Amino acid sequence: ASEWAQSIAPLEFLISKDPENVGYLTQLGNAYNKLNNTTKSEEVFSRLIKLEPDNKDHYFYFGKALMEAGKYSQARTQFLKASDVGNGWALPIFYEGFLYEQSAGGCTDFDRKVVYLLAQNTYRKALSMDSNLSEARDRINALSGAVPTKEDYFFRGIKSGQSMPITCVGWIGKSVTAP
């Protein structure tokens, strides 16, 4: 982390001489992110987005910074924007699934399985957008034993095609459909 801390002053100096240099700003935003200085990282990535609103990477790295700060709802917004600006870029959708997967831990048994199902569905969406995204395939397989089983649905009286709202993680605000 010390090399990241040592990079801040020189980068800020360079930016003071060339305030719209996207390369310097990107490095500075990433350095602040590595140092867990979310406020500064957010400021830099917001500035980058204003300078280059059509650059998918700025939204993506902003999303990663927010994710690492635990601001999952805001991170999802940036990941979705990155995918949109990137004309269906799959990697940010993979990260959206990762946000859901990371959030499942605070839920009880069945609710946790439903959140994992949402994560798995989101990974499937990313994989359908880019069949070379092997990380998505890996996560789909890793979660295969963590999603609701036929017995889970049966004992809860949930029918195939029934919508199941996710309520244990407030920021998600989505539902999944029982297979």
Where are these regions (language model features)?
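TPR/TPR-like (Sel1-like) alpha-helical repeat modules
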Residues: R76, L80-G86, E101, D111-S134, ...
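Terminal, low-structured helical/coil segments at or just beyond the last alpha-helical repeat
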Residues: K125-P179
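Canonical tetratricopeptide repeat
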Residues: Q27, Y61, Y95-E96, R139
